[in-house]
């Protein structure tokens, strides 16, 4: 599983009785036919997994639910992929994804945009059933800092994610160049990257932050910067929204389903570094706007994107599958 998918499934494990995550090292994906041999299903009555290698777990006796946490086969992703990834996505991974669809009992996706993208790119009929269940966040764990001071003296911007081209890390130095002097971008390095960005006074690394420490990291920040080019349904955005942060993001994929432009943050043309800097500067100059947008985002999380809501929908789905 990818990092976000792994976290989402781990969250389900903490909330649903008899739901167990069986992890495997990413290196085993080079020998996917070995996966059933190195993992133990322990008498499972239902399999819930991502589509990448689901075909190898598709036994007729056990119903399988697959969830698209993202869709890397998307052609729009190719400019942001390595040569190896381009070949992998266009050949074996696409074949395995189609096999997974055939073997699955039910297909879900974490956003409307992901569901539509899967249908379009794989040539599926528009009526092909893909149930959308939005990712959720623990709104009791990720909370705003009730003692935060909103002022114009400094503004702390957070980039949360791996330093990959898909996440838009390569735009950070250029965005930083256009920011006002009182603004600093703090960036995480994720779990899979040791890259360090250029040494700029307003660009600072916070290293790899453990998941359990992320609520405190968001509380220390004023704005979330999300220049990613493709997201199934970003957990980082949900976490930041729950902590009362406005979000400045690319206007693409599922991000408009999370962020309401002008109310919870700003959506910029993809890769427009000047637009990103302009919106960040605007938020830095207006503590009141940051507070209003942060409160709007927190309310939206409580209404639509809580962990409890996500769990309830998956529980209903699993019960339906097992009953039928």
Where are these regions (language model features)?
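Membrane-proximal helix-turn-helix segments that form the acceptor-binding/catalytic region
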Residues: 87-107
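Carbohydrate-associated surface elements
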Residues: 113, 136
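Conserved donor-binding/catalytic core segment of Leloir-type glycosyltransferases
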Residues: 149-167, 173-180, 186
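Short alpha-helical donor nucleotide-sugar binding micro-motif in glycosyltransferases
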Residues: 208, 216-221
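Aromatic "clamp/platform" in nucleotide-sugar-dependent glycosyltransferases that forms part
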Residues: 229
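Short hydrophobic beta-strand element within catalytic cores of glycosyltransferases
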Residues: 246-249
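Conserved acidic donor-binding segment of nucleotide-sugar-dependent glycosyltransferases
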Residues: 261-262, 266-273, 282-287
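A short, well-ordered alpha-helix in the C-terminal region of glycosyltransferases
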Residues: 275, 282, 289-304, 310-316
């Amino acid at each position: 599983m990818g990092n976000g998918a792994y976290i989402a499934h781990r969250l389900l494990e903490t909330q649903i009785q008899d739901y167990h995550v069986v992890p495997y090292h990413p290196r085993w994906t080079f020998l996917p036919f070995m996966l059933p041999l190195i993992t133990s299903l322990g008498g499972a009555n239902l399999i819930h997994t991502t589509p990448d290698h689901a075909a190898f777990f598709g036994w007729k006796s056990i119903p399988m639910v697959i969830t698209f946490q993202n869709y890397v086969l998307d052609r729009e992703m190719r400019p942001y992929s390595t040569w190896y990834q381009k070949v992998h996505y266009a050949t074996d991974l696409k074949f395995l994804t189609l096999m997974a669809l055939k073997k699955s009992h039910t297909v879900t996706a974490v956003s409307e945009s992901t569901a539509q993208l899967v249908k379009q790119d794989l040539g599926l009929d528009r009526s092909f059933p893909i149930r959308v269940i939005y990712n959720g966040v623990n709104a009791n764990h990720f909370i705003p800092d009730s003692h935060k001071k909103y002022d114009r003296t400094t503004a702390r911007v957070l980039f949360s994610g791996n330093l990959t081209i898909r996440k838009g890390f390569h735009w950070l130095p250029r965005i930083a160049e256009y920011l006002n002097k009182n603004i600093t971008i703090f960036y995480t390095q994720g779990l899979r990257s040791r890259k360090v960005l250029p040494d700029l006074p307003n660009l600072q690394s916070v290293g790899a932050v453990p998941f359990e420490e992320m609520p405190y990291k968001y509380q220390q920040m004023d704005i979330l910067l999300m220049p990613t080019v493709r997201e199934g349904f970003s957990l980082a955005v949900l976490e930041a929204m729950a902590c009362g942060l406005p979000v400045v993001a690319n206007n693409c994929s599922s991000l408009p389903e999370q962020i309401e432009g002008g109310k919870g943050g700003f959506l910029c043309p993809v890769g427009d570094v000047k637009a990103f800097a302009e919106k960040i500067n605007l938020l830095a100059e207006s503590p009141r706007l940051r507070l209003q947008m942060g409160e709007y985002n927190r309310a939206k999380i409580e209404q639509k994107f809580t962990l409890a809501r996500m769990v309830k929908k998956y529980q209903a789905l699993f019960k339906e599958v097992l009953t039928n």
